[in-house]
């Protein structure tokens, strides 16, 4: 498969030390490799979430780790969006290139709305100190969000990119995993809408289906891939501090 399109992945992290490795392994081992992966540590206070995030960032040059004060899930996702929008200016005190290390950056922006403390990137991403000092956000074609207590099938990105041609959003279904509790009957949103795999949905069609089936609520965050240019032009961000953000 042609892998010229770059996918930006945003993964908020908050006290998920039990699940984070499974999540990140599912990302690292995707069959689609052209990925730029932003981990946003939202002020985790457990013992290992931040250290696990640093471990993966050190090993894989596709990762960048942003450590910020706790602000909620929406704020963490918005940091990822703004990173890919190239809204952040980075500076580093690093004066010497050190192999196999994490390079630390700070924000040079006058405004730091989301209270970002540090940014980390593997030295594997750079050839020399000049490249480190000129670090900026990569350009992406598509963006997708993943919660850090979830994980993907290993061909998830490949299957999404295959379907992104000519559309703004690819919406996919999901499965629930029940651990140590009785499995409940559960219908996903896609099952309520009863859209079949591969269906092209126009906005009017989607609204009509919601009316027909008396579906009065809908959410979308991690259930699909979005054309980043579409998201940027719409200037869409997640709303902070709301229920089920």
Language-model features and meaning:
Residues 1-245:
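Nucleotide-sugar donor-binding/catalytic module of glycosyltransferases
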């Amino acid at each position: 498969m042609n892998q010229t399109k770059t996918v930006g992945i945003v993964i908020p992290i908050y006290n998920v030390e039990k699940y984070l490795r499974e999540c990140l392994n599912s990302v690292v081992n995707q069959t689609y490799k052209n990925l730029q992966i932003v981990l946003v540590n939202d002020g985790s206070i457990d013992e290992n979430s931040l250290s696990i995030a640093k471990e993966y960032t050190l090993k894989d040059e596709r990762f960048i780790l942003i450590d910020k004060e706790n602000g909620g899930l929406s704020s963490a996702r918005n940091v990822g969006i703004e990173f890919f929008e190239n809204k952040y200016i980075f500076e580093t005190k690093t004066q010497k290139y050190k192999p196999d290390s994490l390079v630390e950056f700070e924000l040079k922006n006058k405004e730091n709305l989301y209270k970002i403390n540090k940014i980390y990137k593997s030295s594997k991403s750079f050839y020399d100190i000049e490249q480190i000092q000129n670090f900026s956000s990569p350009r992406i074609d598509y963006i997708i969000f993943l919660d850090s207590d979830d994980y993907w099938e290993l061909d998830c990105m490949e299957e999404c990119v295959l379907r992104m041609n000519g559309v703004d959003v690819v919406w996919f279904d999901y499965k629930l995993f029940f651990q140590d509790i009785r499995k409940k009957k559960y219908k996903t949103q896609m099952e309520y809408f009863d859209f079949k795999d591969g269906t092209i949905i126009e906005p009017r069609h989607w609204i009509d289906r919601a009316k027909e089936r008396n579906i009065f609520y809908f959410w979308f965050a991690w259930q699909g891939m979005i054309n980043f240019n579409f998201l940027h032009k719409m200037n869409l961000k997640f709303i902070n501090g709301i229920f089920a953000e």
